[in-house]
Each structure stands twice: as structure tokens, then as C-alpha cells.
Amino acid sequence: QHTFRPNRSTHQVPFYWTFLLGIMSGMRTNEMCQIRCSDIRKEKNIWFMFVEDSEETRVKTENAIRKVPVHPQLIELGFIDYVVTLKKQKKERVFWELREERDGFASKVSRHFNERFLPAVGVWEKYTKVLYCTRHTFINKLYSEKVDENIIKMLVGHEKEFTMKHYGGDPFTPEVLLEEISKVNYSKINWKKLKL
């Protein structure tokens, strides 16, 4: 717990939230690290994170442009409250502490997770266990819960053209997307001890 929870005064908040976002949204590391406060907003009274291609943000492929419901556990942990506070402070990015480098905004967070956090908790394997594995974990959880494969592809930004070709337009409502992502559950985690 001490290893995982950040010290608010030392710009460590991104280390806390990016891991949680990874296991509960499946977003790519740079997608999480570059997300803007304006990208987190409600649609039909449901909170979403919009992954967009713009002058300020980059996506891996066109398929990566999507919207991901904010998992109820993230809301319970205070993620939306944190974002609302940042909006009041006129912050542009959620993780404003991070600076863009050659490969995007994720370098600092990835180094911390891969070189400090994982070795500290005893699960480090060079080039094998990395922050990006949270995305794989999320996808595996969706499959284990028998979530429709097309919904999985929409949530994680895979093969968007395939989905649209078969269904046309935006086939799944915000309510359906929230219901399906809520099936991702980590029952062995003591969330109360992790809340900031």
C-alpha cells in the first residue's frame, strides 16, 4: 500500500491513476498519460473518457478513436472528483505534471512503473511485466466475462471498421457500454486501502 499510494506533494499522482485506469479502461499508456480534462465528460448522464486525435493528442490508429465509460470503481476512488477539481483549476491535462517527450507523455510513468513499482512488489520481469500489461489484463477480463467481442473492440480501439460495417453508426448505447465495462471486477483488491 505504501509503495502504491502517491505523495500528493511530489507530483506522483499520475503513478497512482494510470495503473488504475489501465486495469479498468484498457487504454494504451500514452492515451492515459495525454488525456485532457475536456476529454472526460458526460454523455446521457454517463461519464466517458474520449480518446481523440487532435493537435494536442495522438492516437496509434484511426481505430483508437473511441469513448470509454469511466468504470464505477474509478468513480468510487475519486477519479471524477479529481478531474472536476482540475477543471476548476483550469488545468488542460489530467496529468499536467507529465511533459511530452519524443514518444509522447508516457515515458516518466512507464519508467516508474517498470523500474520501481514492479520490482518493489516482487513481480518484475524485464520486458515482460510492464505497465502496458494492464491493457492486456483488462481485455482478458472482458473476455472472461463473456462480453460481446464487438463491444470489446470498441472499448479498446481494435478493428473499428469491422464493427461499423456490421452494425452501422454507433451500435451500442452508453448504457450498454457502461454495463459491460462494469463486469470487469478485481474482487481481491482492497479498494478502501487504496483510496486517496
Predicted regions and their residues:
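Short, basic (Lys/Arg/His-rich) helix/loop patches that form interaction surfaces
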Residues: 2-9, 25, 89-93, 101-102, ...
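Catalytic-site neighborhood detector that most strongly recognizes the C-terminal catalytic loop/helix
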Residues: 156-190
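Exposed loop/turn and edge beta-strand positions of beta-sandwich/beta-sheet ligand-binding modules
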Residues: 15, 45, 64, 125, ...
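Basic, Lys/Arg- and aromatic-enriched nucleic-acid-binding interface segment
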Residues: 1-29, 33
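Major-groove DNA-contacting interfaces characterized by cationic-aromatic clusters
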Residues: 72-111
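Tryptophan-centric aromatic hotspots in well-structured domains and transmembrane helices
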Residues: 16-17, 47-49, 79-82, 131-134
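Active/binding-pocket-proximal capping segment
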Residues: 38-50, 69, 87-89, 112-113, ...
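Conserved tyrosine-mediated DNA breakage-rejoining catalytic core shared by Y-recombinases
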Residues: 34-77
